[in-house]
Amino acid sequence: DLRRALNAATRKLDAWAMVDDMPPGNLRLRRQIALRYLAQGFSVPVEEIVLSHGALEALNLCLQALTRPGDAVVVESPCFYGALQALERLGLRAIELPTDAREGLDLSALAGVLERGEARACWLMPNFQNPLGALMPEAKKRALVELLARHQVPLIEDDVYAELYQGGVAPLPAKAFDRQGLVLHCGSFSKSLAPGYRVGWAAAGRFAPQLQRLKLMSSLS
């Protein structure tokens, strides 16, 4: 069904379709993603959503928007190996913090790092952390977002496994508790719908203009 729908849509494309879909990306798809957030109980403006070629590109765009070579980024220990590779490629340093297999990152350790002003950003997986599978409780997610807001340190939220939840009500992302536009929520349909289509996005908060500009530059190169 998905293949037939894609073929039908492709046949209907006109010469201006590629121009219309330049960054931040297809408006109809961004509206549908915004509706998905609304269905979870919180609002994300369509203008905040930037489409990408899978979640990993979105995560990399977030890193580029927030950091410069030599900056330090907080990650979980252990963490997704692709995060460490991305940091190394951009000349960034990893601050690895202990992570519980049930409830996720140690917020006390994070508070110490933030008090010392050592971190430029955080790359974390509050939901279904890779490789531990930890699911941070909602109260702890709220505390995480509030802690980062006090120090004005942005959070890159890697939420690629959210679509695989098998229970009745999916856990909220940390983005749901963001009131200052500091959480850059990255998602993807690659794990649940069609890995080969590489459809991802970032709901980038106050950093959406920077992401859109970076995505445009990479699309034109």
Give the residues covered by each predicted segment:
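PLP-dependent aminotransferase class I/II
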Residues: 182-221
